[in-house]
């Protein structure tokens, strides 16, 4: 199986077992640890949970952006969403796709005209769609 597809399937499995964090930080320590969808991509692909995921969103985003495998998963999920990826302006004035913002925002906030964000089942479904697409279109 293609590594990206396997990573995405692991993400879906984790959410089905432990849930999804949609709170202010990338991770939440409750009875079980839950992760924001972007942080979960990092945890699955890198095999570690950085302490900053609980305390520092900016540092968390920088870590996730530095992980090629996590970003590949987030791009794959972004590709199967109904909305276009948003762009963020960098320090030098260039506009770049912001996959972390796109995917995390989609999973944690209600769409226009709705009062609730996607359910965990809907999030899992999109992740599995991305996994299927990654496996089908693997080179």
Where are these regions (language model features)?
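Active-site nucleophilic cysteine motif
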Residues: 31-44
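Charged interaction scaffolds used for protein-protein
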Residues: 1-21, 25, 41, 46-139
């Amino acid at each position: 199986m293609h590594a990206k597809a396997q990573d995405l399937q692991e993400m879906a499995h984790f959410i089905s077992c432990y849930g999804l964090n949609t709170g202010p930080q990338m991770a939440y320590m409750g009875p079980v640890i839950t992760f924001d969808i972007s942080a979960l991509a990092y945890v699955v692909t890198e095999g570690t949970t950085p302490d900053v995921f609980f305390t520092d969103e900016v540092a968390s985003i920088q870590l996730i952006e530095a992980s090629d495998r996590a970003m590949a998963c987030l791009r794959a999920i972004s590709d199967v969403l109904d909305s276009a990826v948003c762009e963020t302006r960098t320090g030098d004035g260039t506009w770049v796709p912001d996959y972390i913002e796109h995917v995390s925002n989609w999973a944690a906030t209600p769409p226009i005209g709705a009062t609730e964000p996607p359910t965990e089942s809907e999030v899992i479904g999109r992740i599995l769609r991305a996994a299927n697409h990654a496996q089908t279109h693997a080179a």
